[in-house]
């Protein structure tokens, strides 16, 4: 089984017992969450979402992605600005698909 779900503003193709990374969610590690914005479940396609369809996931961990370094340089002004950014994420594991 597979599904396409919306979490945040992104779409993810997920399979059963699959792990995937989403933008940071405010949920403790080990908590079971339900993603109810399901665009597609197997061959059923929603308009835009499927009614009464959910993907049940467990929060495995929170973390930070690899650092992205940014350098801004203005030529002939002797100006150099350097900073970095690490985007937070949440790792989810799909437990089951529910469709009533």
Curated annotation (Swiss-Prot):
**In the record, which residues are listed under signal peptide?**
none
**Superkingdom of this entry's organism?**
Bacteria
Task: Please tell me one Gene Ontology term that the record gives under cellular component.
Answer: ribonucleoprotein complex
Keyword field? Ribonucleoprotein, Ribosomal protein, RNA-binding, rRNA-binding
Per the record, the similarity remark reads:
Belongs to the bacterial ribosomal protein bL21 family.
What this chain does, per the entry, is described as:
This protein binds to 23S rRNA in the presence of protein L20.
Q: What is this protein's record name?
A: Large ribosomal subunit protein bL21
Gene expressing this chain: rplU
